[in-house]
Amino acid sequence: MTVTQTNLDGILPLVARGKVRDIYQVDDNMLLFVATDRISAYDVIMENGIKDKGKILTQLSVFWFNLLSDVIPNHLVASSDKDIFAKLPEQLSEPKYKAQLAGRSLLVKKHKLVPLEAIVRGYITGSAWKEYKKSSTVHGLPVKSGLQESEAFEKPIFTPSTKAEQGQHDENISPEQAAQLVGEELCAEVAQKAIALYSKARDYALSRGIILADTKFEFGLNENNELVLVDEVLTPDSSRFWDAKKYELGRSQESFDKQFLRDWLTSHQLNGKEGVSMTEEIAAKTAAKYKEAYEALTGKTWA
């Protein structure tokens, strides 16, 4: 069953519907994060979904939250269906609701969000490569000359962006601009934690034959104003993963993500257009990439 939108008939209030997640309020302190099978490209959500995508994103996030818990606390309250349904209204255990929620939901603690996308880059690619070719900078930061496409930076760099409303574009900003936005002390802590998280994840991924080129973290503040890791973590939606065996300096790399979909949209001049449905072949190839990423990173077979 592919779930592109949840409908809980008002049993829990819907707080937000993002590009992928439907978020419900459980009580004053808790939210239910439901990762649907929606997929977007070029800031447009496709009409049809990718089978099991939401489940893979959810299980991969749980895997990383556990692996990285010694670096920073996270917002997880419950991640197993048994524990989640025990804390939800009984009605939601009925088959029509359970089918929408099982395997793709997380019960999380509510936090005050830090209004930054904490992007960490270990390799020069994508928009960073485009900027570097023009100005030898990345997010306005001077970077050493002579780098080739997909080359590793000497050290991972923190390149934040603003958190845009849905339908708007996140805007790349310099660390100095980020400090003006959230305060110097908080910005420095976000940068330090984001780089520590990236570094641990990069080393683990490399041990599994995967290069973590870059990723995006989001943070919140708890009641004691301490930093907490929130949202999703190190999924193909928030990260660029490359196969280490196929890595080749001086060119763009194939990612474990929705590149098939982007390429198909571009070749048919559909990028940025609303109301587009993927072909079965493109949906299946994209689903296979998400599954491949899960299996490569966790060492588990996706059932």
UniProtKB/Swiss-Prot annotation:
Biological process per Gene Ontology, one example term: 'de novo' IMP biosynthetic process
Pathway: Purine metabolism; IMP biosynthesis via de novo pathway; 5-amino-1-(5-phospho-D-ribosyl)imidazole-4-carboxamide from 5-amino-1-(5-phospho-D-ribosyl)imidazole-4-carboxylate: step 1/2
The keyword Nucleotide-binding is assigned to this record: yes
MF terms in GO: ATP binding; phosphoribosylaminoimidazolesuccinocarboxamide synthase activity
The EC number(s) this enzyme carries: 6.3.2.6
Alphabetized UniProt keyword annotations: ATP-binding, Ligase, Nucleotide-binding, Purine biosynthesis
GO cellular component, one term: cytoplasm
InterPro entries: SAICAR_synt/ADE2_N, SAICAR_synth, SAICAR_synthetase_CS
Similarity section: Belongs to the SAICAR synthetase family.
Protein name: Phosphoribosylaminoimidazole-succinocarboxamide synthase
Organism classification: Eukaryota, Fungi, Dikarya, Ascomycota, Saccharomycotina
